[in-house]
Amino acid sequence: MAKNIQAIRGMNDYLPAETALWQRIENSLKQVLSGYGYNEIRLPIVEQTPLFKRAIGEVTDVVEKEMYTFDDRNGDSLTLRPEGTAGCVRAGIEHGILYNQEQRLWYVGPMFRYERPQKGRYRQFHQLGCEVFGLQGPDIDAELILMTARWWRILGIADHVKLELNSIGSLDARARYREALVAFLEQHKDQLDEDCLRRMYTNPLRVLDTKNPQIQVLLNDAPVLTDYLDDESRAHFETLGELLTQSGIPYTVNPRLVRGLDYYNRTVFEWVTTSLGAQGTVCAGGRYDGMVEQLGGHATPAVGFAMGLERLVLLVQSVNPDFKAQSGVDAYLISSGAGTQIAAMQLAEKLRDALPQLKLMTNYGGGNFKKQFARADKWGARVALVLGENEVAAGQVVVKNLSNGEQDTLAQADVASRLATLLD
């Protein structure tokens, strides 16, 4: 017997029992995006490797250790996308939709990072991202956060996520802060672990994000980034806080929040939860006003966020188990006897025309009525439609409510209205 081929570690299959909930959650997210006037953009999974090195930063963990990179047959270096923002910016520049224009875009799909698989973190994972171009005020930052808060209310998880905010200022402000932080870290080199020593000169702000508890205590005495903010960034951040407060969105200022990608400036934010064990990020984003120019376009303000769908699904399942997708089908069409198969197919198509949202499954593969009713139960059908030779000859259908066993024989023309009533 041939050896079974398994899925790659950290790259998961999602079976129909799971995808129904995914679809309901995704549809809820998309409905809100549409209501705010955001439009979908579809992007390639594979991009040229230099795109991510320039956008994300050469000395980030993502570029140094986590990207799936390979050479194609022409010798070009390609990478499976580890995140969506860089590709979205590349597409906007390439197709000329950013310069002197306002764009509100969203995308959803798989991303790839070579990480150690664990609960809610996988090597192939799914993100929904949202990007806004051409608006530089704190009001659009606030709208993005308000939109995410609306999602949490719809999904029933609002009490289980908390908003953390910070401003990392302008490039000049960060350069001044970087000097002060490096000077502080140099005074305490003997207390730093190997990872922080490596980051101290290449990407010192990432030291603030360390998970080492001893270094976290040390950092309590480190310089604070907010003390180095330029006046414009400070005013931007203060106005954002006022807008959120007036909108009833509570938040905490986290001075260590810097995000793991180099392209951010000014506003950064994360929605975090402790309901999945250790604190985890559900949604994160911020401003990246320099990226469009950095990738070859005209200077364009930009802000956005990304949300990991695996972690979101886990959170909904954990804290709001009543948020379920409809399982099974609405109706199961049973037929037996000479001439009933084509009659069943024709009836099914008419019902789908009349009720476009109807989930109707037709029995194929034969079987007596008992076996077909068993299949209807297996698929979770709420109603059975029965066609025998007598019903076909009379132009009728038996409609049986499978929850209480009640049934009626109706003319075929009346079946759609009865189904609509039963399934309402």
UniProtKB/Swiss-Prot annotation:
Gene3D superfamilies: Anticodon-binding domain, Bira Bifunctional Protein, Domain 2
Catalytic activity: tRNA(His) + L-histidine + ATP = L-histidyl-tRNA(His) + AMP + diphosphate + H(+)
Assigned keywords, A-Z: Aminoacyl-tRNA synthetase, ATP-binding, Cytoplasm, Ligase, Nucleotide-binding, Protein biosynthesis
GO biological process, one term: histidyl-tRNA aminoacylation
GO CC annotation: cytoplasm
GO MF entries: ATP binding; histidine-tRNA ligase activity
EC number(s) recorded for this UniProt protein: 6.1.1.21
Location of this chain's protein in the cell: Cytoplasm
Family matches, as PROSITE patterns: AA_TRNA_LIGASE_II
Entry-linked InterPro entries: aa-tRNA-synth_II, aa-tRNA-synth_II/BPL/LPL, Anticodon-bd, Anticodon-bd_dom_sf, His-tRNA-ligase, HisRS-like_core, HisRS/HisZ, HisRS_anticodon
NCBIfam families, per the entry: hisS (TIGR00442)
Family the entry assigns: Belongs to the class-II aminoacyl-tRNA synthetase family.
Subunit structure: Homodimer.
Protein name per Swiss-Prot or TrEMBL: Histidine--tRNA ligase
Record organism: Pectobacterium atrosepticum (strain SCRI 1043 / ATCC BAA-672)
